[in-house]
């Protein structure tokens, strides 16, 4: 467009100069051959005097150029948002698709300076931020798809987390590798957020979530617990086997959650936890195991676990033995004391985000799926707790809107009934953003037509770039068919003629159609652009909004997730029992804690240090050192 403007200016100036010179020359010659030399000047007749002619010509030039510039800047070259070498059709007979015009964009969306926009950021157009207004009737579920390196975090996740914090809304983030916690935890705490991290990469740096505490004696929650665990750990098993396995796990969870005395036999510090379930399942022979719990159910036929245990006990002996053995293998991660610790204490309250503004980060591994069932459990019970709280309110909504940013969606694990959750959570003030790298990832998790239903439940889809054929074809089809004007020119000339002189020239115009975006155009889309599909609107093409342009970006102070010290970890240091020969006093204990704790500098907010269980960092004392004597050690 800049080149076009330059061509218009240059061409107009040159053309005006040539025209003035020609007219002046003609007028001068004509005046010389006139009857009295000056009485009949053709130049004066045409231009009403040279000075007046130049003024008139200049005014006309500025008027024409101004109209052209206005059309280019505010209306588009043709007013249809199309800047390719394509002439849209004059009718809708061949297709109605087109890019969203700027006029429609300004009516349907919030457009302006980032400081004046509080909605969900989609991108920028002509330097203005474009956002989905929060008061829009459309749901706020977003589907984001972009290949690796397409700026999913920089251009969508990070700026929209900043927007949510300005609105005072809670957020739950599936945080691959912990990058979002590292960049945003500190300033969110300064804004008054309750910040927690469920870190499945660095377990010592994770706050604890008592997953078995979600069950209590609720049979429905116990069923969900067993279903989610087995769905994430037992792919490919026969239906009868899965039925027995789920009921054994459900029965043991209910037994531990409801029977304090029995849980105490596991001899753990915190007894009614998932680690106890693992110990009880793997302790003793098969006959001893069955004898113990058959006796419990026989003596208490109204026990909440009776029905589940009966289904397991009704399987054949071989199936019962295999099921118990396999569950022990599936839950072997609880052999790790750190896994037991991060699932045993009630430091993360899943209902709290609906009550007050919270930011929970779930740090996921992008290298293995060992702890994937824990992240799946976390999000499954998060949905349950938030919906239960919302339904208990007079408005049937969360007091504080909750935003779920499910980055690397395929790494979270299976969420039971996710499609139903998408369709029902909007009215409860829960917004879900699903982020993936390519459509095949979603198709594997939700086969058949389910993946299409998932996307259909989101009124806004953002495509940041694609490198796979499936996604590119889907975007091309989603963009639709546009009508185009076809200009056809036919020329004929003698085959042996050395000079190109057409003998026949025909020009005709007709209507045709083409994809608004061909597959190859999706592949080759510039990385700085994104495509936004909004229900009821044409495709909108925007430039990506980099988070560094957001006003809150200057408040970012990076603190690695590995430096977080949860309460259970600090308590474990205080409970540390010395080994033989170890001298314990307050000085050594303080030194031990100091070595394990992160260094708190002026760059870390003191409140962050307090939440991490650290003492205030004193200012270093200034000491004077004299010259070192010969043979004296450098270290005092």
Show the residue positions of the predicted features.
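Basic- and hydrophobic-enriched, low-structure N-terminal and domain-boundary segments
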Residues: 1-150, 154-160, 167, 507-510, ...
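Intrinsically disordered, low-complexity N-terminal regions enriched in serine/proline/glycine
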Residues: 6, 47, 277, 292, ...
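A short glycine-/small-residue-rich loop at the edge of a beta-strand within enzyme catalytic domains
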Residues: 13, 106-109, 373, 409, ...
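Intrinsically disordered low-complexity regions specifically enriched for long asparagine
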Residues: 33, 482, 517-521, 620-622, ...
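Low-complexity, polar-biased intrinsically disordered regions enriched in Pro/Ser/Thr/Gly
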Residues: 112-113, 231-237, 261-269, 486-510
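P-loop NTPase motor domains
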Residues: 121-126, 133-430, 445, 520-541, ...
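Conserved ATP-driven motor cores of ASCE-family P-loop NTPases powering translocation/secretion/packaging/pilus
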Residues: 422-424, 428-531
């Amino acid at each position: 467009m800049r080149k076009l403007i330059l061509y218009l200016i240059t061409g107009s100036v040159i053309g005006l100069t040539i025209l003035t010179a020609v007219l002046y020359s003609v007028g001068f010659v004509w005046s010389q051959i006139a009857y009295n030399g000056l009485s009949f000047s053709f130049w004066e007749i045409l231009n009403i005097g040279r000075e007046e002619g130049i003024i008139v010509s200049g005014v006309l030039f500025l008027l024409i150029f101004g109209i052209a510039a206005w059309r280019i800047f505010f209306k588009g070259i043709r007013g249809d948002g199309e800047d390719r070498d394509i002439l849209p059709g004059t009718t809708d007979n061949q297709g109605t698709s087109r890019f969203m015009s700027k006029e429609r964009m300004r009516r349907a969306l919030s457009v302006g300076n980032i400081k004046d926009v509080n909605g969900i950021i989609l991108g920028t157009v002509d330097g203005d931020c474009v956002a989905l207004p929060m008061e829009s009737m459309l749901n706020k579920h977003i589907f984001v798809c972009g290949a690796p390196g397409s700026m999913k975090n920089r251009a969508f996740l990070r700026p929209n987390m900043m927007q949510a914090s300005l609105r005072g809304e809670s957020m739950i983030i599936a945080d691959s590798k912990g990058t979002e916690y590292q960049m945003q935890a500190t300033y969110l705490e300064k804004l008054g957020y309750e910040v927690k991290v469920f870190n499945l990469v660095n377990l010592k740096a994770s706050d604890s979530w008592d997953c078995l505490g979600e069950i209590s004696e609720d049979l429905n929650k116990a069923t969900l617990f067993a279903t989610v665990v087995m769905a994430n750990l037992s792919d490919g098993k026969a239906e009868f086997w899965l039925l027995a396995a789920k009921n054994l796990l459900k029965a043991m969870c209910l037994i531990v959650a409801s029977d304090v005395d029995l849980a105490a036999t596991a001899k753990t510090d915190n007894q009614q936890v998932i680690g106890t379930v693992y110990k009880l399942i793997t302790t003793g022979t098969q006959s001893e195991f069955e004898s113990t719990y058959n006796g419990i159910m026989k003596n208490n036929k109204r026990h909440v676990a009776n029905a589940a245990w009966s289904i397991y006990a009704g399987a054949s002996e071989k199936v019962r033995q295999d099921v118990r053995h396999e569950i022990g293998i599936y839950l072997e991660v609880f052999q790790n004391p750190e896994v037991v610790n991060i699932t045993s204490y009630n430091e993360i309250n899943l209902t709290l985000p609906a009550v007050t503004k919270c930011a929970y980060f779930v740090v996921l591994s992008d290298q293995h799926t060992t702890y994937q069932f824990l992240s799946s459990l976390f999000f499954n019970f998060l949905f349950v707790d938030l919906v239960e709280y919302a339904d208990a309110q007079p408005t049937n909504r969360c007091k504080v809107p909750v935003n779920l940013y499910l980055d690397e969606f395929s790494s979270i694990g299976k969420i039971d009934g996710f499609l139903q959750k998408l369709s029902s959570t909007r009215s409860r003030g829960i917004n879900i953003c699903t982020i993936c790298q390519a459509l095949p990832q979603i198709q594997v998790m939700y086969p058949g037509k389910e993946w299409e239903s998932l996307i259909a439940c989101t009124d806004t889809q953002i495509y940041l770039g694609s490198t796979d054929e499936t996604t590119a074809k889907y975007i091309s089809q989603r963009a639709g068919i546009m009508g185009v004007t076809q200009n056809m020119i036919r020329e004929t000339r003698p085959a042996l003629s050395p000079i190109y002189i057409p003998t026949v020239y025909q020009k005709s115009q007709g209507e045709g159609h083409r994809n608004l975006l061909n597959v190859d155009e999706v592949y080759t889309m510039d990385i700085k652009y994104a495509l936004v599909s909004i229900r009821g609107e044409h495709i909108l093409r925007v430039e990506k909004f980099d988070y560094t342009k957001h006003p809150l970006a200057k408040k970012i102070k990076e603190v690695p997730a590995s430096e977080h010290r949860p309460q259970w970890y600090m308590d474990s240091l205080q409970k540390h029992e010395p080994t033989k020969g170890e001298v314990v006093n307050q000085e050594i204990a303080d030194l031990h804690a100091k070595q394990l704790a992160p260094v708190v500098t002026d760059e870390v907010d003191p409140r962050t240090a307090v939440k991490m269980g650290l003492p205030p960092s004193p200012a270093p004392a200034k000491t004077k050192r004299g010259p070192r004597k010969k043979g004296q050690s450098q270290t005092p």
